[in-house]
């Protein structure tokens, strides 16, 4: 199990990926402690001096003008958590909950939230013990922060609600006891610090980014395989073409294709002197389309990495000045827009893959048997597999509709513009699953197409890609139950079977 020493504000994308993929052990770097303690001291001074500060000794939202008596401050924070735990939908899986918790810890440990070290350590203990609060997937509009999801997370700290421990749903109090942990009592501002933030939105979008990276790499490999299967030209990947345009994503994607389509290919040699002038766009324009997608992936990474290390609480405690200032860092508009742009990229990756599948079905375009099977008529081959890919590509076009342009006012119009970032991030998961299904069909089809070039082989890396599939899925000589083959290819893609053939591109 990996151990991550958390230096607040310095989480890397690879660390976040590890948190999502595997249980981890967290340690808080000692450099964070002074800042955490200073912010708590500032909050305590405000309470002791009788000053009014939002979220410390006032109500919330439209009730911000209501002053709360000192003796009610602890109850105020507990009531906040209980009342805001109003999410609905299926529980998030352990990986997503773990990622949200780590993001929350990272933000709180920056020392702007006025939350005690002991509460942050209690959150770290949940992660390290594998106690995962039950967090429903739906119920946040991404401003004022992800209130409902983070309230459900916080319930477990209080010994309320449910949590998963060693794969079993238990009352939170029981889960804590089995893990050797104790509930905490919240002090002034701590409930608000736990609930305010963009951590759920950011985690949702990060998962979309992680899956998009795998899909991108897999699609590049399958695009190269299809190029070989239909005897496509390698000249469109010439570095001079892409340097003339100057789009970095395009330049880098063309380089990836040259890496995969090396000169040592019997298929390439077989049609080196053919008279075909130009390939269809789905082959020839792969660097341009996939390059644009890569640019979106890189921009999304930049935004999400900044947000993963951000302080998105409100109000913020500036201990050096003894001030607590209300702002709007909880508004997840940057995350929503990044997720919307990523959705476009995921949709286009799948759409281009589907067009290449369709190209292979057409005997006039591919110079292969119709639907990639001999004895057509008796056999339908890949006919309906391409229909499945088309259905998935069409679904993605609808799912790619932007969420960040939507807004509904909440909290009696006090919170009158919201980001819808959680929904923007969450739909990426469905889009990724759809696109993975499309690419799986292309992988199956392209390998079948190369098989049908009897006696000819592709480049060494692409032969690895074909061999990986053929170890699990046999060549099609006649029709058979098709769905299990798509499922197998999809599972291999999710495991990174093709991603490992592509050099780092992010």
Swiss-Prot record:
Cross-link 5-imidazolinone (Ala-Gly) residue location(s):
143-145
Q: List the disulfide bonds.
A: none
GO MF term (any one): histidine ammonia-lyase activity
Keyword annotations for this protein, in alphabetical order, are: Cytoplasm, Histidine metabolism, Lyase
Query: Which reactions does this protein catalyse?
Result: L-histidine = trans-urocanate + NH4(+)
- Which Pfam families does the record match to this protein? Lyase_aromatic (PF00221)
Q: What is its main location?
A: cytoplasm
2,3-didehydroalanine (Ser) modifications at = 144
Per the record's keyword annotation, is Repressor included, yes or no? no
Cellular component per GO? cytoplasm
Q: Which NCBIfam families match?
A: hutH (TIGR01225), PRK09367.1 (NF006871)
Per its record, how is this protein called by name? Answer: Histidine ammonia-lyase
Instruction: Write down the species.
Output: Salmonella schwarzengrund (strain CVM19633)
Gene name?
hutH
């Amino acid at each position: 199990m990996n151990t991550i020493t958390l230096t607040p504000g310095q989480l890397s994308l690879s660390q976040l990926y590890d948190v999502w993929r595997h249980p981890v052990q967290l340690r808080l770097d000692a450099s964070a402690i002074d800042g955490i303690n200073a912010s708590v001291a500032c909050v305590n001074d405000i309470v002791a001096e009788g000053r009014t500060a939002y979220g410390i000794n006032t109500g919330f939202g439209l009730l911000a003008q209501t002053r709360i008596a000192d003796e009610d401050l602890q109850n105020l924070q507990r009531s906040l958590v209980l009342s805001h735990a109003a999410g609905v939908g299926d529980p998030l899986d352990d990986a997503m909950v773990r990622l949200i918790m780590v993001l929350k810890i990272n933000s709180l440990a920056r020392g702007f939230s006025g939350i005690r070290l002991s509460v942050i350590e209690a959150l770290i203990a949940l992660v390290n013990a594998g106690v995962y609060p039950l967090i429903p997937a739906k119920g946040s509009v991404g401003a004022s922060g992800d209130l409902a999801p983070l309230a459900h997370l916080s319930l477990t700290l209080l010994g309320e609600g449910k949590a998963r421990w060693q794969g079993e749903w238990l009352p939170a109090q029981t889960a804590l006891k089995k893990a050797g942990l104790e509930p905490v009592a919240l002090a002034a501002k701590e409930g608000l610090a736990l609930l305010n933030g963009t951590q759920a939105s950011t985690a949702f979008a990060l998962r979309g980014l992680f899956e998009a990276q795998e899909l991108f790499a897999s699609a590049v490999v399958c695009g190269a395989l299809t190029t070989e299967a239909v005897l496509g030209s390698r000249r469109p990947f010439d570095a001079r073409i892409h340097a003339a345009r100057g789009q970095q994503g395009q330049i880098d994607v063309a380089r990836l294709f040259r890496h995969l389509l090396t000169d040592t290919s019997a298929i390439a040699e077989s049609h080196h002197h053919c008279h075909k002038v130009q390939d269809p766009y789905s082959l020839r324009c792969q660097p341009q389309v996939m390059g644009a997608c890569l640019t979106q992936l890189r921009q999304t990474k930049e935004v999400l990495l900044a947000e993963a290390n951000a302080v998105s609480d409100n109000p913020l405690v500036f201990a050096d000045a003894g001030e607590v200032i209300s702002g709007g860092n909880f508004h997840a508009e940057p995350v929503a827009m990044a997720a919307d742009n990523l959705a476009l990229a995921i949709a286009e990756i799948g759409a281009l893959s589907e067009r290449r599948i369709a190209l292979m079905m057409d005997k006039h375009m591919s110079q292969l048997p119709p639907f990639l099977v001999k004895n057509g008529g008796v056999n339908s081959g890949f006919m309906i597999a391409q229909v499945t890919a088309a259905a998935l590509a069409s679904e993605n076009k609808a799912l790619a509709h932007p969420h960040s342009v939507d807004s509904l006012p909440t909290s009696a119009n006090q919170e009158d513009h919201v980001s819808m970032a959680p929904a923007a991030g969450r739909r990426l998961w469905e889009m990724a699953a759809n696109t993975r299904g499309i690419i799986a069909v292309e992988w199956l089809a392209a390998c079948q197409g190369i098989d049908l070039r009897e006696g000819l082989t592709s480049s060494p890396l692409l032969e690895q890609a074909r061999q990986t599939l053929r170890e699990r899925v046999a060549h099609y000589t006649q029709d058979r139950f098709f769905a299990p083959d798509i499922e197998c290819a999809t599972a291999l893609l999710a495991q990174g079977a093709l991603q490992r053939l592509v050099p780092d591109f992010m």
